[in-house]
């Protein structure tokens, strides 16, 4: 009889596995063992855990990245980068060495197949880890400076990368910065810090500064409004310093009779001069090397001023673009139109002028010897009467503001100089506007004299505490000299001027004519004597006296070739009445002769040069005279009407 097995217990899968452990073990041992290399994530994670083997590999990788640029084959580069471009989340402060090695890689040495992943890695790294945000910004902003090489013997500057590759790197850097700002808006201040730190040194070639400045202008397309003003200030501070340095170099060359020529006349383009000098690269003297640097500086200032004007034009209303459509064809704005990156919370277009106005106060009013950069504001105000009105009102408020520190007093004096420059030089400032402001200035001067100039026994003229008064006085004299021809043609204006009693200020114990610019004083004296307003020539000292203020004359000359086509139509030449021409010529010729004691400079002064002060219609009245003297802008020559001898009254021929 067979035993039934229906009720026999069945083994579960667990019991089955336990019943044959040897079989499982033999199957595992039968598989061949392969030593797989650890991935980049595993190396980093184990290194952070303190694993010794991982620490050794970590150091080897960091050392290998130092020689990354020397590798000829792309395969090992791709293999190495593949290990780390996807593990930005695994990085932290203890992996700083590895991160710095990756950030320092030259972008042109990274294979094109992984360059996009490398870009995304930098974005993710800056967004995820606060400790690396500034490091990423610094490395990326450095890529906004063009890569160049300089031959020390000849000073010839050559680009390391092609224009196409360099522009690709610029675009990649802007993409990274804009992406990080969009995801991490609070990092804007860290970006600003890097922008200021990466600014090329003054000893670097001008082409690097020009390229960096253009990228900072493009950055305005996407950076938040909270740092937009600060970036513009960084741009204008550097431009003002370079402009001042260029002015000092030109003045030193005039005094030392250096053979260096900048060749800034109409017939010779700056670009042609530079190319002509760089051909003879075998034997370059120190003088030629210095000349080449000066020409590069002029090109750089011209290029950046043109770029800023281009940005301003792209930001104004379309109505202005339509009115000046022909002018836009002359403007190379392709670099700006092709830039498509935008950002959130950028500076509104209508706020751009207010930002520039603040930058003028913070960077330009204390910059004494700036020649060219200040013309940017002259151009900006020409686009709208509202801009012109805002500018004049703001400058006047800064002028009469109560100073709390010596720097505030200098700023007030600078504001008075700019106010005078706008009223005297800008063609778009109407006669009525200039007269209204001139009357406002005179009323302030009269009140100042009544308050501080009464009681001659207690007044010591020429003190620095009265510096603002003397700067405003010079502004009054300058504007009157430039615009009196228009005022006297209006009987009501002329009668109003006679009622002012200008002698009340001129003959006050503060003696303003004694402490202002001598050419301005002589010109004002000759004009007022001709109009029988006041006789004051005897007040002007023969010898130069120390001025209690830092005088400046914005918009006095403009020799930058490319951007001059936007500036020269806005400028007003000094144009007296025809009957006053001979008197003014004698006064200014006498001043030029005494300013330069040399016999050669005295012989250069001729009566025909006085015609530089005339417009074309006045020149016709002089009986067929040629009217204009062809100017040569050489630093080794001196002329009757030059910036150093007769500031404020320089003719405007380019």
Curated annotation (Swiss-Prot):
GO biological process, one term: transcription initiation at RNA polymerase I promoter
Residue numbers spanned by region Disordered: 1-37
Main location group: nucleus
GO cellular component: a single term: nucleus
Keyword Nucleus belongs to the record: yes
Biased composition (Basic and acidic residues): 13-31
Localization, UniProt: Nucleus, Nucleolus
GO molecular function: RNA polymerase I core binding; RNA polymerase I general transcription initiation factor activity
Keyword terms: Nucleus, Transcription, Transcription regulation
Entry superkingdom: Eukaryota
UniProt keyword Zinc present: no
Function: Required for efficient transcription initiation by RNA polymerase I (Pol I).
Cross-referenced PANTHER family: RNA POLYMERASE I-SPECIFIC TRANSCRIPTION INITIATION FACTOR RRN3-RELATED, TRANSCRIPTION INITIATION FACTOR IA RRN3
Name of the protein in question: RNA polymerase I-specific transcription initiation factor tif-1A
Organism of provenance: Caenorhabditis elegans
Gene it is expressed from: tif-1A
């Amino acid at each position: 009889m067979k035993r039934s097995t229906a009720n026999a217990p069945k083994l579960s899968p667990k019991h089955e596995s336990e019943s044959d452990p040897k079989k499982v073990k033999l199957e595992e041992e039968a598989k061949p063992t392969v030593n797989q290399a650890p991935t980049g994530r595993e190396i980093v994670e184990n290194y952070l855990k303190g694993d010794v083997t991982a620490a050794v590999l970590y150091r080897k990788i960091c050392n290998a990245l130092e020689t990354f640029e020397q590798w000829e084959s792309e395969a090992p580069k791709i293999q190495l980068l593949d290990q780390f471009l996807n593990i930005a989340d695994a990085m932290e402060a203890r992996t700083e060495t590895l991160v710095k090695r990756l950030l320092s890689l030259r972008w042109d040495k990274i294979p094109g197949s992984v360059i996009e992943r490398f870009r995304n890695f930098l974005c993710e790294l800056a967004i995820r880890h606060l400790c690396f945000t500034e490091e990423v910004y610094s490395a990326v902003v450095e890529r906004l400076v063009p890569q160049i090489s300089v031959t020390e013997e000849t000073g010839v500057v050559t680009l390391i990368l092609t224009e196409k590759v360099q522009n690709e790197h610029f675009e990649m850097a802007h993409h990274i910065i804009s992406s990080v700002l969009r995801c991490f808006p609070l990092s804007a201040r860290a970006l600003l810090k890097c922008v200021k730190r990466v600014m090329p040194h003054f000893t670097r070639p001008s082409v690097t500064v020009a390229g960096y400045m253009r990228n900072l202008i493009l950055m305005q397309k996407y950076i938040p409004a909270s740092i937009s003003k600060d970036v513009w200030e960084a741009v204008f501070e550097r431009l003002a310093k370079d402009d001042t340095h260029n002015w000092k170099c030109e003045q030193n060359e005039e005094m030392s009779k250096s053979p260096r020529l900048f060749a800034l006349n109409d017939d010779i383009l700056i670009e042609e001069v530079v190319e002509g000098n760089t051909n003879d690269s075998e034997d370059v003297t120190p003088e030629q090397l210095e000349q080449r640097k000066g020409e590069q500086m002029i090109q750089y200032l011209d290029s950046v001023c043109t770029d800023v004007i281009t940005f301003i034009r792209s930001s104004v209303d379309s109505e202005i673009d339509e009115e000046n459509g022909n002018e836009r064809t002359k403007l190379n704005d392709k670099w700006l139109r092709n830039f498509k990156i935008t950002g959130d919370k950028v500076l509104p277009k209508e706020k751009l002028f207010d930002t520039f106005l603040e930058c003028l106060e913070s960077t330009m009013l204390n910059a004494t010897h700036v020649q060219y950069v200040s013309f940017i504001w002259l151009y900006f105000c020409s686009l709208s009467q509202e801009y012109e009105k805002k500018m004049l009102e703001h400058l006047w408020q800064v002028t009469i503001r109560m100073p709390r520190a010596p720097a505030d007093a200098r700023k007030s004096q600078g504001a008075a100089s700019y106010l005078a420059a706008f009223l005297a030089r800008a063609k778009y400032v109407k006669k009525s506007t200039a007269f209204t402001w001139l009357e406002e200035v005179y009323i302030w001067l009269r009140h100042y004299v009544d308050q501080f100039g009464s009681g001659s026994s207690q007044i010591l003229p020429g003190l620095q505490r009265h510096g603002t008064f003397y700067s405003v006085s010079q502004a009054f004299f300058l504007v009157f000299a430039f615009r009196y021809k228009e005022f006297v043609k209006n009987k009501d204006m002329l009668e109003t001027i006679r009622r002012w009693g200008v002698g009340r200020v001129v003959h006050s114990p503060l003696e303003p004519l004694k402490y202002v610019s001598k050419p301005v004083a002589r010109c004002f004296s000759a004009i007022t004597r001709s109009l029988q307003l006041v006789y004051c020539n005897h007040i002007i000292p023969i010898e130069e006296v120390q001025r209690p203020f830092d005088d400046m004359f914005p918009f006095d000359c403009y020799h930058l070739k490319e951007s001059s086509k936007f500036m020269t139509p806005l400028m007003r030449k000094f144009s007296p009445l025809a009957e006053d021409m001979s008197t003014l010529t004698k006064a200014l010729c006498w001043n030029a002769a005494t300013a330069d004691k040399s016999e050669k400079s005295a012989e250069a002064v001729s009566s025909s040069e006085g015609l530089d002060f005339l417009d074309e219609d006045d020149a016709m009245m002089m009986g067929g005279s040629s009217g204009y003297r062809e100017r040569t802008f050489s630093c080794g020559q001196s002329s009757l009407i030059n910036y150093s001898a007769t500031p404020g009254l320089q003719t405007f021929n380019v």
